[in-house]
């Protein structure tokens, strides 16, 4: 007899470099705790980010820019992700890297604008009238065919719906009868009909029929409790980019050209300013009517020094437009040349006139104690057992080299411990792995010492 174990098919979450970040780790007063929500240290930067998230929530921050500046490995990307976690999934957060704007198919400014629109949400409130209940009767009424002949057409459908509160008889359009047939609605089914669109949805068989033995595997649902006729408010969250794309590429035409267009590989096309202007008009009309509200989100541009002078000039205009999100830049450069210029150098690789418009948040280097805490959190996230000695040693390595290098030694050290049959990662495992691999500084030193042996 063969017995097989059924393995779970749920997707295992891969541990990324910022999986441990769960939020900014602030208390009720907005002060940073020393270590909370996966973040350690950087108290002043975290408090500043906390104030910005509050401003975003109260919608007073749109069209402003923030720059996270600091040396590599001081948690700039982690802070931006923590802000996204704090804001929740209702506020759009669009991360991008500075080098993403360079494409052979579309302009740099188009990529920037696309991401700008992705970071602006629109919350549309819609009131739907719904008839819901168990079908008690379903009678199509026929009339003579106006075209002549012996055939008859359906003029209307009489349907009876029952809920726990009462019953109602409805006279429906013949087009709804087709929907009822498609859904295979019978007496005893629980359905709901949208009054505005005439959409019909069969939810299942009423559970009063559950005792009847039937060969078909039916899904039994309870009798609806409210009234037959109800008004439901449905809230939809879309971004402006979704609206742009939906209108830029209309789906389904019957002519041969659109058929061919659907078969061919879709080329990335630019969305024109005219189309965006039209969509903005419609959005403004919705906002004036109170049907929708604008939710300015966050656009996070990492490695902002990779943008060139043209992109920066475009950012000026984009930041000052009426519909603009909050832009968070991150850069680990000091004074460097602005890309696309010959000899203009500037702090963080950003032109001075744009630096004038941004609020700068500094991130400081971590102390050995903070590094130790971060490595401990990473070990917990990756599910590794590590001794105190090994943690302290990794903290020292992180201080001499970089935090990233110290964190990268964790998994190989745990693998070595497992090969040796140990459950806990000890100091000697870390030392052995550290001897096998080089960090950037020691590798550069070897290059300097042996520069004659390497090719130029």
Swiss-Prot record:
<dbReference type="InterPro" id="IPR042487">
    <property type="entry name" value="RuvBL1/2_DNA/RNA_bd_dom"/>
</dbReference>
<keyword id="KW-0347">Helicase</keyword>
<dbReference type="Pfam" id="PF06068">
    <property type="entry name" value="TIP49"/>
</dbReference>
<dbReference type="GO" id="GO:0031011">
    <property type="term" value="C:Ino80 complex"/>
</dbReference>
<dbReference type="GO" id="GO:0006310">
    <property type="term" value="P:DNA recombination"/>
</dbReference>
<dbReference type="GO" id="GO:0016887">
    <property type="term" value="F:ATP hydrolysis activity"/>
</dbReference>
<comment type="similarity">
    <text>Belongs to the RuvB family.</text>
</comment>
<dbReference type="GO" id="GO:0006281">
    <property type="term" value="P:DNA repair"/>
</dbReference>
<keyword id="KW-0227">DNA damage</keyword>
<dbReference type="InterPro" id="IPR010339">
    <property type="entry name" value="TIP49_P-loop"/>
</dbReference>
<dbReference type="GO" id="GO:0120293">
    <property type="term" value="C:dynein axonemal particle"/>
</dbReference>
<dbReference type="GO" id="GO:0005576">
    <property type="term" value="C:extracellular region"/>
</dbReference>
<keyword id="KW-0234">DNA repair</keyword>
<dbReference type="GO" id="GO:0005829">
    <property type="term" value="C:cytosol"/>
</dbReference>
<dbReference type="GO" id="GO:0006338">
    <property type="term" value="P:chromatin remodeling"/>
</dbReference>
<protein>
    <recommendedName>
        <fullName>RuvB-like 1</fullName>
        <ecNumber>3.6.4.12</ecNumber>
    </recommendedName>
</protein>
<feature type="binding site">
    <location>
        <begin position="70"/>
        <end position="77"/>
    </location>
    <ligand>
        <name>ATP</name>
    </ligand>
</feature>
<dbReference type="GO" id="GO:0003678">
    <property type="term" value="F:DNA helicase activity"/>
</dbReference>
<dbReference type="GO" id="GO:0071339">
    <property type="term" value="C:MLL1 complex"/>
</dbReference>
<dbReference type="GO" id="GO:0070286">
    <property type="term" value="P:axonemal dynein complex assembly"/>
</dbReference>
<comment type="function">
    <text>Has single-stranded DNA-stimulated ATPase and ATP-dependent DNA helicase (3' to 5') activity suggesting a role in nuclear processes such as recombination and transcription. Proposed core component of the chromatin remodeling Ino80 complex which exhibits DNA- and nucleosome-activated ATPase activity and catalyzes ATP-dependent nucleosome sliding. May act as a negative regulator of embryonic heart growth.</text>
</comment>
<keyword id="KW-0805">Transcription regulation</keyword>
<dbReference type="InterPro" id="IPR003593">
    <property type="entry name" value="AAA+_ATPase"/>
</dbReference>
<dbReference type="GO" id="GO:0000492">
    <property type="term" value="P:box C/D snoRNP assembly"/>
</dbReference>
<dbReference type="GO" id="GO:0060420">
    <property type="term" value="P:regulation of heart growth"/>
</dbReference>
<dbReference type="GO" id="GO:0097255">
    <property type="term" value="C:R2TP complex"/>
</dbReference>
<dbReference type="GO" id="GO:0006357">
    <property type="term" value="P:regulation of transcription by RNA polymerase II"/>
</dbReference>
<keyword id="KW-0547">Nucleotide-binding</keyword>
<dbReference type="GO" id="GO:0007507">
    <property type="term" value="P:heart development"/>
</dbReference>
<keyword id="KW-0233">DNA recombination</keyword>
<dbReference type="InterPro" id="IPR027238">
    <property type="entry name" value="RuvB-like"/>
</dbReference>
<dbReference type="Pfam" id="PF17856">
    <property type="entry name" value="TIP49_C"/>
</dbReference>
<dbReference type="InterPro" id="IPR027417">
    <property type="entry name" value="P-loop_NTPase"/>
</dbReference>
<keyword id="KW-0067">ATP-binding</keyword>
<comment type="subunit">
    <text>Forms homohexameric rings. Can form a dodecamer with ruvbl2 made of two stacked hexameric rings. Is a component of the RNA polymerase II holoenzyme complex. Component of the chromatin-remodeling Ino80 complex. Component of some MLL1/MLL complex.</text>
</comment>
<dbReference type="GO" id="GO:0005524">
    <property type="term" value="F:ATP binding"/>
</dbReference>
<keyword id="KW-0539">Nucleus</keyword>
<dbReference type="GO" id="GO:0035267">
    <property type="term" value="C:NuA4 histone acetyltransferase complex"/>
</dbReference>
<dbReference type="GO" id="GO:0045893">
    <property type="term" value="P:positive regulation of DNA-templated transcription"/>
</dbReference>
<keyword id="KW-0804">Transcription</keyword>
<feature type="region of interest" description="Disordered">
    <location>
        <begin position="1"/>
        <end position="20"/>
    </location>
</feature>
<keyword id="KW-0378">Hydrolase</keyword>
């Amino acid at each position: 007899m063969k017995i097989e174990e059924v393995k779970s098919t749920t997707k295992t979450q891969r541990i990324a470099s910022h999986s441990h970040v769960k939020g900014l780790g602030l208390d009720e007063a907005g002060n940073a705790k020393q270590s909370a929500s996966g973040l350690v240290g950087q108290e002043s930067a975290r408090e500043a980010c906390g104030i910005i998230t509050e401003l975003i929530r109260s919608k007073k921050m749109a069209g402003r820019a923030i720059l996270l500046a600091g040396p590599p490995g001081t948690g700039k990307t982690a802070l931006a992700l923590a802000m996204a976690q704090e804001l929740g999934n209702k506020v759009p957060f669009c991360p991008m890297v500075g080098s993403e704007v360079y494409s052979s198919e579309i302009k740099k400014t188009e990529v920037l604008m696309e991401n700008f629109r992705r970071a602006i949400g629109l919350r549309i409130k819609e009131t739907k009238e719904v008839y819901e209940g168990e079908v008690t009767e379903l009678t199509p009424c026929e009339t003579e065919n106006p075209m002549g002949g012996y055939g008859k057409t359906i003029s209307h459908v009489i349907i009876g719906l029952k809920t726990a509160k009462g019953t109602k008889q409805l006279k429906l359009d013949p087009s709804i009868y087709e929907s009822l047939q498609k859904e295979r609605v019978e007496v005893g089914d629980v359905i709901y009909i949208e009054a505005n669109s005439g959409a019909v949805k069969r939810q299942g068989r009423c559970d009063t029929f559950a005792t009847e033995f039937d060969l078909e595997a039916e899904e039994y649902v309870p009798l609806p409790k409210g009234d037959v006729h109800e008004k439901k408010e449905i809230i939809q969250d879309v971004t402006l980019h979704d609206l742009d794309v939906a209108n830029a590429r209309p789906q389904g035409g019957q002519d041969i050209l659109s058929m061919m267009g659907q078969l061919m590989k879709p080329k990335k096309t630019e969305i024109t300013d005219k189309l965006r202007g039209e969509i903005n008009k419609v959005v403004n009309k919705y906002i004036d009517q109170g049907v929708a509200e604008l939710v300015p989100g966050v656009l996070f541009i990492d490695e902002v020094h990779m943008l060139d002078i043209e992109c920066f000039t475009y950012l000026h205009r984009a930041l000052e437009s009426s519909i603009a999100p909050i832009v968070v830049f991150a850069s680990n450069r000091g004074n460097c040349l602005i890309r696309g210029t010959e000899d203009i150098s500037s702090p963080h690789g950003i032109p001075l006139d744009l630096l004038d418009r941004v609020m700068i948040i500094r991130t400081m280097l971590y102390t050995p104690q903070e590094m130790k805490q971060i490595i401990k959190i990473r070990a917990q996230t990756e599910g590794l057992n590590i001794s105190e000695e090994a943690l302290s040693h990794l903290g020292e390595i992180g201080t001499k080299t970089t935090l990233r290098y110290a964190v990268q030694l964790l998994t190989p050290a745990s693998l070595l411990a497992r090969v040796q049959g140990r459950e806990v990662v000890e100091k000697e495992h870390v030392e052995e792995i550290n001897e096998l691999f080089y960090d950037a500084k020691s590798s550069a030193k070897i290059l300097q010492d042996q520069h004659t042996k390497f090719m130029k």
